[in-house]
């Protein structure tokens, strides 16, 4: 049913890669384009392998002829890719005001990029403001460096923030709103034991302080602010519905006392608002029109409804998207921070982490994040993040600019008997002759990877890519000319003056080998031929693995 469509993908891939289809690239493209197959990766692998094997048995000329005759539309440079459009927002009246609301516990990670990009896309569509609101109302969970790292990450992603607000600078506003709610009987001060309060709430029983008059509650709130009440001895509680089906929504805590210095305000404040209170107040006073958030915030949305209704405020439009699971990716900020402090990681950009800056170091492009989340949209169903699709998208952005180099992992030296000297002229990019070539004068010695060497059978003829043919005779390697006699395996190689090189991978492993001299001084994304894409970030001696 899908064989012809997958073969077309394999043919186009081979056309783009000098006549050889790359299996992993084809699998990624199939997963990205054929939605019905995404739930059956085993079938995708089988069908893609069959298509790649078939295409790779064809000559380059045959592939070019087929693609140019049968799929000319795919070759048009001005052909636009399939456009995925986010659904329209309801209730838009001229422009929108939207927000990003991270906690400054660390830099942004890949999970944060969804809310950043979706909000940015809507503000671009309708015009208006995108507010960065740093929610730093928990002084015990703040990394002071995050105040700078978060805007840096957003700038790298291409997100256009028009205004920045820091919640720790708005405590007087929160206190003012709280006092008004106390005066109107919607907020009370509870001095019950914490566990007793929790038990009563679960049983829908009011605590002893619930019906205290506003005057008493105002007096106690002022004593909390003045430092006359100890931490844990009193909290300010939003009066809701004790019979609400969700116990979390019943009389929820709006303020608590924390005796800890805040990185920005020091000990100026000791009564800190809980997230649902400060968020609702800010959403009103900042003029939010639309809020995008995960389904995990549905309970908080319901809690915040009381703040809006008690104050007579209009609520923004809320959209709750499904949760995304990121398999095999370290995203929990507290654990990443502990690992950094323990020396397990070399900082927030360590490629073993899932932070935005680690992804940038590996070579992922800002456009990849944007395309992926636009394609995912605002769906309410939970999903698993697809690294195959993500990598396939990134490959589209990096491949045209990725210079090609040769890397031999665990190198083995081979001497070609009968070689009188060869000249290799290797293009930096098979589709961009304007990038130039690497030129090497080869005597009789090259290096290949141990993995390739171990697979060469006695008597087998193989091709050193873009150089010559060689026949193995026991432990000897015999030069066998440059003319193709039959289809043979192609092996990557490095010249004798190659240098030692390492590729650092996100699973913590390191591949060591040799890399060709022409890579010296190169910075940016490269494709190490028949190995994968890497990012030459800051060194000639190492690169960071991006993906296959």
Swiss-Prot record:
Q: Output the Pfam families linked to this UniProt entry.
A: tRNA-synt_1c, tRNA-synt_1c_C
**HAMAP family, alphabetized:** Glu_tRNA_synth_type2
Q: Does the keyword Metal-binding apply?
A: no
Kindly list the cysteine pairs connected by disulfide bridges: none
Q: What is this protein called?
A: Glutamate--tRNA ligase
- Going by the record, the broad EC class of this enzyme is ligase
Q: Where in the cell is it found?
A: Cytoplasm
GO annotations of cellular component type: cytosol; protein-containing complex
Biological processes per GO annotation: amide biosynthetic process; glutamyl-tRNA aminoacylation
Q: What does this protein do?
A: Catalyzes the attachment of glutamate to tRNA(Glu) in a two-step reaction: glutamate is first activated by ATP to form Glu-AMP and then transferred to the acceptor end of tRNA(Glu).
Please name the GO terms that the record assigns under molecular function.
Answer: ATP binding; glutamate-tRNA ligase activity
Q: Where can the motif 'HIGH' region be found?
A: 102-112
Q: Which InterPro entries match?
A: aa-tRNA-synth_I_CS, Gln/Glu-tRNA_Ligase, Glu-tRNA-synth_arc/euk, Glu/Gln-tRNA-synth, Glu/Gln-tRNA-synth_Ib_cat-dom, Glu/Gln-tRNA-synth_Ib_codon-bd, Rbsml_bL25/Gln-tRNA_synth_N, Ribosomal_bL25/Gln-tRNA_synth
- NCBIfam families for the chain: gltX_arch, PRK04156.1
Q: Which gene encodes it?
A: gltX
Q: Which SUPFAM superfamilies match?
A: Nucleotidylyl transferase, Ribosomal protein L25-like
The lineage is: Archaea, Methanobacteriati, Thermoplasmatota, Thermoplasmata, Thermoplasmatales
Name the Enzyme Commission number(s) assigned to this protein: 6.1.1.17
The reaction(s) this protein catalyses: tRNA(Glu) + L-glutamate + ATP = L-glutamyl-tRNA(Glu) + AMP + diphosphate
């Amino acid at each position: 049913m899908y064989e012809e469509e997958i073969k077309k993908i394999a043919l186009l891939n081979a056309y783009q890669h000098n006549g050889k289809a790359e299996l992993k690239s084809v699998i990624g493209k199939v997963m990205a384009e054929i939605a019905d197959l995404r739930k059956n990766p085993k079938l995708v692998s089988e069908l893609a392998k069959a298509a790649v094997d078939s295409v790779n048995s064809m000559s380059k000329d045959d592939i070019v002829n087929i693609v140019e005759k049968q799929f000319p539309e795919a070759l048009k440079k001005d052909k636009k890719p399939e456009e995925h459009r986010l659904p329209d927002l309801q209730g838009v009246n001229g422009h929108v005001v939207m927000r990003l609301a991270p906690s400054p516990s660390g830099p942004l990670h890949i999970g944060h990029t969804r809310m950043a990009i979706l909000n940015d896309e809507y503000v671009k569509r309708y015009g208006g403001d995108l507010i960065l609101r740093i929610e730093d109302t928990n002084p015990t969970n703040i990394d002071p460096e995050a105040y700078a790292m978060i805007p840096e990450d957003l700038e790298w992603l291409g997100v256009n923030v028009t205004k920045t607000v820091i919640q720790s600078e708005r405590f007087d506003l929160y206190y003012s709103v709280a006092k008004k709610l106390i005066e109107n009987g919607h907020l009370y001060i509870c001095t019950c034991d914490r566990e007793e309060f929790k038990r009563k709430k679960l049983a829908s029983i009011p605590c002893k302080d619930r019906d205290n008059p506003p005057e008493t509650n105002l007096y106690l709130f002022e004593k909390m602010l003045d430092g006359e009440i100890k931490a844990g001895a009193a909290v300010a509680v939003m009066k809701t519905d004790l019979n609400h089906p969700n116990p979390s929504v019943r009389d929820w805590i709006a303020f608590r006392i924390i005796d800890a210095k805040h990185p920005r305000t020091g000990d100026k404040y000791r009564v800190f608002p809980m997230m649902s209170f400060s968020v609702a107040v800010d959403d009103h006073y900042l003029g939010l029109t639309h809020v995008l958030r995960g389904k995990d915030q549905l309970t908080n949305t319901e809690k915040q409804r009381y703040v809006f209704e008690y104050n007579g405020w209009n609520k923004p439009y809320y959209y709750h998207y499904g949760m995304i699971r990121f398999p095999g990716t370290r995203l929990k900020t507290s654990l990443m921070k502990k690992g950094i402090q323990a020396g397990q990681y070399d900082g927030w950009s360590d490629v073993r982490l899932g932070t935005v800056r680690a992804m940038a170091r590996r070579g992922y492009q800002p456009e990849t994040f944007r395309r992926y989340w636009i394609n995912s949209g605002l769906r309410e169903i939970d999903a698993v993040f697809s690294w195959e699709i993500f990598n396939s998208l990134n490959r589209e952005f990096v491949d045209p600019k990725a210079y090609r180099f040769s890397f031999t992992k665990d190198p083995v030296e081979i001497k070609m008997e009968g070689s009188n000297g060869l000249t290799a002229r290797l293009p930096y990019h098979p589709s961009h002759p304007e990038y130039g070539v690497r030129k090497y004068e080869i005597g009789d010695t090259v290096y290949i990877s141990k993995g390739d060497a171990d697979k060469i059978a006695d008597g087998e003829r193989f091709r050193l890519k873009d150089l010559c043919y060689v026949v193995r005779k026991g432990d000897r390697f015999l030069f066998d000319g440059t003319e193709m006699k039959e289809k043979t395996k192609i092996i990557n190689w490095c010249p004798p003056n190659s240098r030692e090189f390492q590729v650092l991978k996100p699973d913590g492993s390191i591949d060591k080998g040799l890399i060709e001299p022409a890579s010296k001084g190169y910075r940016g994304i490269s494709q190490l031929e028949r190995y994968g894409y890497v990012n030459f970030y800051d060194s000639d001696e190492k690169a960071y693995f991006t993906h296959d």
